[in-house]
Amino acid sequence: MASERLPSRPACLLVASGASEGVSAQSFVHCFTLASAAFNLQVATPGGKAIDFVDVTESNARWVQDFRLKAYASPAKLESIDGARYHALLIPSCPGALTDLASSGSLARILQHFRSESKPICAIGHGVAALCCATNEDRSWVFQGYSLTGPSVYELIRAPGFARLPLIVEDFVKDSGAGFSASEPDAVHVVLDRHLVTGQNANSTVPAVQNLLFLCGSRK
């Protein structure tokens, strides 16, 4: 009977922020639900910190509450993750990414591996800021020459803390020699370039993750 077992599912690393600014509940729920159906999913945060969910609504509050009770809700330490063990990388929209992931040396090491091996990467909304940590020794960005999307300045400027943001993704991407596009604020907008999928905002989570699943499916 052993020979009739289904092949083991590929492993996907879901990286989220551990900062107080948190992780979008809407984006995380869609990421986790869609990805866990296709992958063996491992959640990781800097220091293994518990996730603070923001923008919790009536529609996802129960899911978030149930998730917190599960054993797999305790994230692994990003610092101890070996990127070579994973087939795909998924970063939901995390306002906190600007605080911790955007300057994470551990995530930079993982992203450099994924870039060199052309493994599928998907980053959404504020999670796109996490990609900014991955620079080469000469300070060039590993995604130079790629096309991306992420939060537009028009979306960011509506938040009260805009003036204090440590990083504007749109500016970083353009200054680093990559292409940036954005649609109207809150519109669904996804860019696929080679093995990199980016979504403009939390509303773009589902089609972005579907593109990640498509990329992984086409590699079998």
UniProtKB/Swiss-Prot annotation:
<comment type="similarity">
    <text>Belongs to the peptidase C56 family.</text>
</comment>
<feature type="glycosylation site" description="N-linked (GlcNAc...) asparagine">
    <location>
        <position position="203"/>
    </location>
</feature>
<dbReference type="GO" id="GO:0005769">
    <property type="term" value="C:early endosome"/>
</dbReference>
<keyword id="KW-0732">Signal</keyword>
<dbReference type="GO" id="GO:0005576">
    <property type="term" value="C:extracellular region"/>
</dbReference>
<keyword id="KW-0967">Endosome</keyword>
<comment type="function">
    <text>Component of the FERRY complex (Five-subunit Endosomal Rab5 and RNA/ribosome intermediary). The FERRY complex directly interacts with mRNAs and RAB5A, and functions as a RAB5A effector involved in the localization and the distribution of specific mRNAs most likely by mediating their endosomal transport. The complex recruits mRNAs and ribosomes to early endosomes through direct mRNA-interaction.</text>
</comment>
<feature type="signal peptide">
    <location>
        <begin position="1"/>
        <end position="35"/>
    </location>
</feature>
<keyword id="KW-0325">Glycoprotein</keyword>
<protein>
    <recommendedName>
        <fullName>Glutamine amidotransferase-like class 1 domain-containing protein 1</fullName>
    </recommendedName>
</protein>
<keyword id="KW-0964">Secreted</keyword>
<comment type="subunit">
    <text>Homotetramer. Component of the FERRY complex composed of five subunits, TBCK, PPP1R21, FERRY3, CRYZL1 and GATD1 with a ratio of 1:2:1:2:4, respectively.</text>
</comment>
<dbReference type="InterPro" id="IPR050325">
    <property type="entry name" value="Prot/Nucl_acid_deglycase"/>
</dbReference>
<dbReference type="InterPro" id="IPR029062">
    <property type="entry name" value="Class_I_gatase-like"/>
</dbReference>
